């Protein structure tokens, strides 16, 4: 059972991934029959994926125009270094993304098959236990969250496009080609973040469905309740393993996403500083779209962090929902045994998301993430202060030298 709104918005995410070759193979989606299955693995799509990856990597060459000679970065070494660091990180992101898809292609296809089998198996259990209205309400709320994320991504892309166009000093074929290459990479990064967010939405959906199933067991008869609880426990364990498998398989690719998001936020805020001190000339439209870019970028980042934390929290907080069943006055021996098994399973299996197995991402880490962005921007501002003081000190030194010569 899938709400039509959630189905349509997930189709949007899927087709974005297909266009930028972020899938190892295509899916066959029949909306009329609500059927979802793997297509026959196509060599054509594999070749298409290869050419898209090569195209994006070669595009990096055209992203270095003569902007260093006659653009707004000409007299700012910090902006130039930021540009080259972003270029290097984009190269790493492209290599890690498509390298993961090519090197782990067969494993990813097996993951697709496993996910579809999982969805069909526990879909019947969900329909049998969970109230239909509660399930549809949950799916509709997740669809709204996904739609909001898509709007944020495209709003940030629009603001960035307008600002990038305004920053062009002259319009010639070489600079326009570099501009188009940057837009292509912006769209690719947009699709990667959209796909990652879509996977998190689906995982969050499954863990929240488990919560609904546990709550629904209160009204069931005692003789059937223990069997339903066993099915819910199996569903939770399979969902947990599926989440771990997804996180491990795309660990490096997701790590490059977070690193690029980090550097993008620093770059945006540092450009905002340059706008505020008039180092970069702008008009009212530039200020408007610049402020919009800051708002949409940070809003989108916080939305991604919040969804990731929601997946981890909804998985690890299942025990709190299970305590409600333990507090029931009449619990049979079979029911008590299933409760004990499920409780032990929850204690031994907790979901944690770590970047490359090192940095754990949770709410405190998100606050540290934002704080480190601001601290790095402040450090970059110190270079501006030194550059502004340097000409003054040189002029004072020359004046002092001329006075000494006149005295002699």
Swiss-Prot record:
Residues 1-44, 104-150, 215-245, 306-364 are cytoplasmic. It is a multi-pass membrane protein. It is found in: Cell membrane. GO terms for cellular component: axon; dendrite; membrane; neuronal cell body; plasma membrane. Pfam families: 7tm_7. InterPro entries: 7TM_chemorcpt. GO terms for biological process: detection of chemical stimulus involved in sensory perception of taste; monoatomic ion transmembrane transport; signal transduction. Keywords: Cell membrane, Glycoprotein, Membrane, Receptor, Transducer, Transmembrane, Transmembrane helix. One of its GO terms (molecular function) is ligand-gated monoatomic ion channel activity. The chain crosses the membrane at residues 45-65, 83-103, 151-171, 194-214, 246-266, 285-305, 365-385. Glycans are attached at residues 277, 404. Disulfide bonds: none annotated. Signal peptide: none annotated. Expressed in the adult labellar chemosensory neurons, labral sense organ and thorax. In larvae, is in neurons of the terminal external chemosensory organ as well as in the dorsal pharyngeal sense organ. The keyword Cytoplasm does not apply. Residues 66-82, 172-193, 267-284, 386-408 are extracellular. Probable gustatory receptor which mediates acceptance or avoidance behavior, depending on its substrates. Belongs to the insect chemoreceptor superfamily. Gustatory receptor (GR) family. Gr22e subfamily. This is Putative gustatory receptor 58b. The gene is Gr58b.
